[in-house]
């Protein structure tokens, strides 16, 4: 769950106008809209006290995007359609051995399409996707890593994975590191997928980042309209 907005965050207000049926008077409802501040990355890494790079001022920008996706039916529908169109129905090949592999690519018995769909979902939702590969004698297992749990190391050579960045952001025991390809450690490595974004060296951004305020405003307006109709 995303933390409550800090005092430093800019609060904006939106007004809904309702016209009375039997008069010319207007009724106004006012409520706060807390939009995350401009998303930036640290310019001077010496000022970053952690070994990983925060994503957002409170390091919870991915968590905010995940929550926003759950609150907005339109946003969720658009992202879901893009994911489905990208992942397709299945992967097809003519090699029998390869076909067996793409139908069962990890210890969780997921297919390549299952993992690819999760990666596409994260890519469109967060602007970042992380694929973990685990080598073993005779083959390799491929997994998806939830993008909300990942933060990039300052060295750009590994990632930090934490199940709950709200509680354990400073607890080394609650997070583990995985090297980024081509580095390999303990037969594991990660591949990071993102698009180029000016002034961003560690993370990508989703395409809809410029519309965050509009999405949030739409959610709040819809809730206010529904409340007034009760």
Question: What label would you give each PLM region?
Answer:
Residues 2-74, 79-230:
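Structured, contiguous alpha/beta core segments that scaffold functional sites
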């Amino acid at each position: 769950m995303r933390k409550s907005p800090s005092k430093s965050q800019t609060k904006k207000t939106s007004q809904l106008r309702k016209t009375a049926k039997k008069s010319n008077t207007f009724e106004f409802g006012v409520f706060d809209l807390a939009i995350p501040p401009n998303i930036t990355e640290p310019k001077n890494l010496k000022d970053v006290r952690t070994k990983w790079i925060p994503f957002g001022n409170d390091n919870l920008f991915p968590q905010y995007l995940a929550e926003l996706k759950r609150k907005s039916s339109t946003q969720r529908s658009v992202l879901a359609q893009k994911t489905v169109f990208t992942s397709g129905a299945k992967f097809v090949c003519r090699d029998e051995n390869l076909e067996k592999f793409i139908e069962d690519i990890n210890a969780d018995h997921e297919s390549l399409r299952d993992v690819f769909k999760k990666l596409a979902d994260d890519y469109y939702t967060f602007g970042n996707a992380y694929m973990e590969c685990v080598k073993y004698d005779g083959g390799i297992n491929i997994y998806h890593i939830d993008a909300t749990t990942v933060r990039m190391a300052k060295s750009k050579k590994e990632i930090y994975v934490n199940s709950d960045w709200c509680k354990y952001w400073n607890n080394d025991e609650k997070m583990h590191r995985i090297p980024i390809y081509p580095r390999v450690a303990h037969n594991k490595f990660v591949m990071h997928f993102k698009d180029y974004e000016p002034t961003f060296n560690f993370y990508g951004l989703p395409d809809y980042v410029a519309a965050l305020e509009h999405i949030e405003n739409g959610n709040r307006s819809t809730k206010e309209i529904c409340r007034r109709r009760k």
